[in-house]
Curated annotation (Swiss-Prot):
<dbReference type="Pfam" id="PF00155">
    <property type="entry name" value="Aminotran_1_2"/>
</dbReference>
<dbReference type="InterPro" id="IPR015424">
    <property type="entry name" value="PyrdxlP-dep_Trfase"/>
</dbReference>
<dbReference type="GO" id="GO:0030170">
    <property type="term" value="F:pyridoxal phosphate binding"/>
</dbReference>
<comment type="similarity">
    <text>Belongs to the class-II pyridoxal-phosphate-dependent aminotransferase family.</text>
</comment>
<dbReference type="InterPro" id="IPR004839">
    <property type="entry name" value="Aminotransferase_I/II_large"/>
</dbReference>
<dbReference type="InterPro" id="IPR024892">
    <property type="entry name" value="ArAT"/>
</dbReference>
<dbReference type="GO" id="GO:0000105">
    <property type="term" value="P:L-histidine biosynthetic process"/>
</dbReference>
<keyword id="KW-0663">Pyridoxal phosphate</keyword>
<dbReference type="InterPro" id="IPR050106">
    <property type="entry name" value="HistidinolP_aminotransfase"/>
</dbReference>
<dbReference type="InterPro" id="IPR015422">
    <property type="entry name" value="PyrdxlP-dep_Trfase_small"/>
</dbReference>
<dbReference type="InterPro" id="IPR005861">
    <property type="entry name" value="HisP_aminotrans"/>
</dbReference>
<keyword id="KW-0032">Aminotransferase</keyword>
<protein>
    <recommendedName>
        <fullName>Aromatic amino acid aminotransferase</fullName>
        <ecNumber>2.6.1.57</ecNumber>
    </recommendedName>
</protein>
<dbReference type="GO" id="GO:0004400">
    <property type="term" value="F:histidinol-phosphate transaminase activity"/>
</dbReference>
<dbReference type="InterPro" id="IPR015421">
    <property type="entry name" value="PyrdxlP-dep_Trfase_major"/>
</dbReference>
<keyword id="KW-0808">Transferase</keyword>
<dbReference type="GO" id="GO:0008793">
    <property type="term" value="F:aromatic-amino-acid transaminase activity"/>
</dbReference>
């Protein structure tokens, strides 16, 4: 007899990460191509030497470092194994069975997964024609069962960020009882000036989610954080799985904050490359939404899978999203040039239905 598991899991699609294979240029997972700084590598080595010891489940030193870095109280900081784990914890902390979690679509693929695993109901609101959050439609979709709203800004995978005024108007329209999570995983690449922490200080229902996986280059160690009202942080601590943020990750994150100036200076190069790649794609005839992150997006619709497969054959791995589009991570200049060589080829333009110029 087959062991019994939850029957509703058959209807839940598991999160699918970006693919990789030896020798390929991987522009599929929004990773930075630069490794940790020497000081961070030293912290990693020191922590690894004590791998026989359990990590600090209270994340005391890391929380203190985050609080000091951003000028908030330690009671306002929660830590998780990447910001995606905090997304899941937020659903568990806010929702009972049948409660609603709202988010735009297409947005971060983990949102529907963590929602349904918790027994909550995902409510999706389509993006606008320019691949941005339709905040008016989202505000109008709030019901008595809405408990949590994820707002990914810059939006993954489409790229645009929301302005402060847009978010203020949205937050003013959403009931205070609804938790609004501003998922700012790509905050460090956003040059618009919008900072979720400014909104956290004015709206007690705002949670700011950030990560050390992207600009800080610690994707392999899995550490992220939430800044929120103390009551929300206390609730997160009750649904947190013990010891999931390991000692190496905590030490690396503390060292990364200490070196944040040098690490964040790297993002200027990524932003410059992002703009260069987008301009080249626009010049080649592609539709490319504005991006405030470390990637660009091609809304190729039903051609997305074929485009991604052809790029992989050319040695460049991208991230297709069903029949919606393809996301391209900004890599090193040489990696970006390899992608552009493919994207401007006759084959790629034919697949994408982009006119081949004489």
């Amino acid at each position: 007899m087959t062991p019994r598991t939850r029957t509703d899991l058959d209807t839940i699609t598991a999160y699918v990460p970006g693919k990789s294979y030896p020798g390929a240029i991987k522009l599929a997972s929004n990773e930075t191509t630069l490794g940790p700084l020497p000081s961070v590598r030293d912290a990693i080595a020191d922590a690894a030497a004590n791998a026989n010891r359990y990590p600090d489940n209270g994340h005391v030193a890391l929380i203190a470092a985050i609080a000091d870095h951003f000028g908030v109280a330690t009671a306002n900081v929660a830590v998780g194994a990447g910001s995606v784990s905090l997304c899941q914890e937020l659903v568990h902390a806010t929702c009972n069975d049948g409660d609603e979690v709202m988010f735009a679509w297409r947005s971060f693929e983990a949102y529907p997964v963590v929602t349904r695993v918790a027994g909550a109901v995902p409510v999706t609101v389509p993006l606008t024609a320019d691949y941005r959050h339709d905040l008016d439609a989202m505000a109008a979709a709030v019901t008595d069962r809405t408990r949590l709203i994820f707002v990914c800004t810059p939006n993954n995978p489409t790229g645009p960020a929301l302005s402060t005024s847009e978010l203020e108007r949205f937050l003013d329209a959403v009931p205070d009882r609804v938790v609004v999570a501003l998922d700012e995983a790509y905050f460090e690449y956003n040059r618009s000036g919008t900072d979720g922490l400014d909104l956290f200080r004015r709206y007690p229902n705002v949670v700011v989610l950030r990560t050390f996986s992207k600009a800080y280059g610690l994707a392999g160690l899995r550490v992220g954080y939430a800044i929120a009202d103390a009551a929300i942080v206390a609730a997160l601590s009750k649904v947190h799985i013990a010891f999931t943020v390991n000692a190496v990750a905590q030490a690396a994150a503390i060292a990364s904050l200490a070196a944040s100036g040098e690490l964040l200076a790297r993002t200027d190069g990524v932003v410059a490359e992002r703009n260069r790649v987008r301009d080249a794609l626009l010049a080649a005839g592609y539709e490319v939404p504005e991006s405030d992150a470390n990637f660009v997006y091609l809304p190729l619709g039903s051609r997305s899978g074929a485009f991604g497969a052809a790029s992989a054959e050319a040695g460049v791995l991208l991230r297709p999203y069903g029949d919606d589009g393809v996301r391209i991570t900004i890599g090193d200049p040489e990696e970006n040039d390899a992608f552009l060589a493919f994207a401007t080829s006759t084959e790629a333009r034919s697949i994408a239905n982009v006119a081949v110029r004489a």
